[in-house]
């Protein structure tokens, strides 16, 4: 398997909209691969960003023969909702279930759906699988927010504020220079009008509670999963991923830490991202081949 970095050219994408829970969600579909698609990849982005930031992931997936779709979470990107907001306790799981169902219904019989979630999107995706809200054929988690790395004071605030002011939004305080070693990506994010640094109290509570709950479900995990995380992550605690990996059955979950990488492993500098994409491609080849074997 060649350890080539993601292509530098950006594939074209188109935007459509759907209604979920009375609000509008933006769906992004990238250009279809040449020939018959091998599967559909559904991407769930992280906190404060949007699906349009996943061109570096979409490009190689298309090259490998996959259709790629993303969507903007509630309160993010081109979707409705206050930036960083969360209007109901189940908003993100409900919306993912809606997009997942819509996507599955579009696919030809037998075509696998692979769910890829990064950071907060990794938390949403894994929590949805743990709660059996969605049942993808396979799951990829990139630096998932399974441990928010909160200090005791932050935990106290999160336990109190959502009961009093659930819609109060505050700054996340993200240090964007620690997103990736690729300075062009950092600057693009810093100047992106669709990105934000806001988080509501209700969303913060979901972030704090859903991670440990998902990790507790790891021993009974059944969905084929690739878990990759950055060892030099300052956005989420790597301990959440390592805890999940230690509890999950090794026959179902393949885990790999990349010690030198920052948070956005798919957006890392080409030389750092190359082994990430090589790992992803090799795992997809094995997983898709296994899913095509007769029962």
Annotate each language-model stretch with its function.
Residues 221, 227-229, 233:
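Short beta-strand/loop motif that positions the catalytic acidic residue
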Residues 118-200:
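Alpha/beta-hydrolase-fold enzymes
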Residues 223, 237-246:
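Short alpha-helix in the alpha/beta-hydrolase fold that links the catalytic acid
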Residues 2-32:
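N-terminal cap/lid segment of alpha/beta-hydrolase-fold proteins
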Residues 107-118:
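Alpha/beta-hydrolase fold nucleophile elbow
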Residues 254-295:
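Catalytic active-site module of serine/aspartate enzymes centered on a nucleophile-bearing elbow/loop
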Residues 48-51, 77-107, 274:
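Catalytic nucleophile-loop/oxyanion-hole region of alpha/beta-hydrolase
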Residues 58-82:
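Conserved alpha/beta-hydrolase
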């Amino acid at each position: 398997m060649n350890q080539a970095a993601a292509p530098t050219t950006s594939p074209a994408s188109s935007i459509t909209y759907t209604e979920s829970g009375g609000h509008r969600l933006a769906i992004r579909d990238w250009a279809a691969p040449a020939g018959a698609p091998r599967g559909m990849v559904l991407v769930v982005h992280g906190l404060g960003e949007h699906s349009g930031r996943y061109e570096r992931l979409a490009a190689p997936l298309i090259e490998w023969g996959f259709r790629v779709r993303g969507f903007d979470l509630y309160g993010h990107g081109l979707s409705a909702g206050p930036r960083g907001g969360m209007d109901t306790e189940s908003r993100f799981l409900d919306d993912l279930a809606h997009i997942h169902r819509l996507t599955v219904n579009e696919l030809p019989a037998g075509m696998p759906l692979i769910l890829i979630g990064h950071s907060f999107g990794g938390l949403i995706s894994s929590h949805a699988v743990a709660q059996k809200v969605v049942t993808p054929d396979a799951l990829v988690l990139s630096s998932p927010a399974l441990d928010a790395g909160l200090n005791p004071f932050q935990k106290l605030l999160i336990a109190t504020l959502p009961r009093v002011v659930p819609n109060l939004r505050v700054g996340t305080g993200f240090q964007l220079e620690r997103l990736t070693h690729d300075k062009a990506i950092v600057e693009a994010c810093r100047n992106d009008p669709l990105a934000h640094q806001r988080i509501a109290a209700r969303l913060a509570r979901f972030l704090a509670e859903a991670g440990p709950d998902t990790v507790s479900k790891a021993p009974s995990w059944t969905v084929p999963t690739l878990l990759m995380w950055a060892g030099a992550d300052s956005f989420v605690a790597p301990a959440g991923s390592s805890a999940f990996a230690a509890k999950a059955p090794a026959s179902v979950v393949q885990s790999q830490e990349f010690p030198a990488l920052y948070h956005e492993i798919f957006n890392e500098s080409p030389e750092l991202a190359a082994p990430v994409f090589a790992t992803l491609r090799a795992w997809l080849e094995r997983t898709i081949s296994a899913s095509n074997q007769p029962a």
